[in-house]
Amino acid sequence: MPYCKLLAFLLSISSAQFAWCAASNEKPLLLRHPTISRTRIVFTFANDLWSVSRDGGDAVHLTTGIGVESDPIFSPDGSQIAFTGEYDGNIDVFVMPAAGGTPKRLTYHPSPDRAIGWTPDGKQVLFSSNRTSYSNFSRLFTVPAEGGPETQLPLDRAVEGSYSPDRAKFAYVPTDQWQRAWKRYRGGQTTHLAGHALRFERAENPAQQFE
């Protein structure tokens, strides 16, 4: 089943569960930030990461320590999970085995760093940060999954993004808008998609809008 269809199915199931819980006076659970591999679904609940089989069943804890975990993202081969962790007042990028284990910290900057993806080869984690922006705009960086120095992407500003399979092009969202959840919103703050040819360092903006 294609990922987009699976997400639509999960949302429909979630809505049905919510309605059932309301009818039976049970409290619904706020499950957020789903990421999907070929066999597992990882999500956040109560500031922790949880994992469940795509076929259904009981969810298991992946993180139980003191702190807040969010934004889990499977590596391309499904063996690792990158996520955003907030511990001791700082927000950084971490990576851990998909089956569970000790998280490895990848970023150490005092500015907030948030995991948003992987490079196609699964060797580096993509994250956003405002660490190099005096105007507080977010920019995108990569950091080796094994640890090491960060590399900034050649983009003036970006909050989300994804590589093409050959890593030659990059699609991204330049700025974040709170109206992004409005369907068919066409006002001045609507979110736009932009593309960047990484091999030639030539940017273009198709000004596409989310429907």
Where are these regions (language model features)?
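Beta-strand-rich domains and repeat architectures in extracellular enzymes and scaffolds
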Residues: 25-52, 71
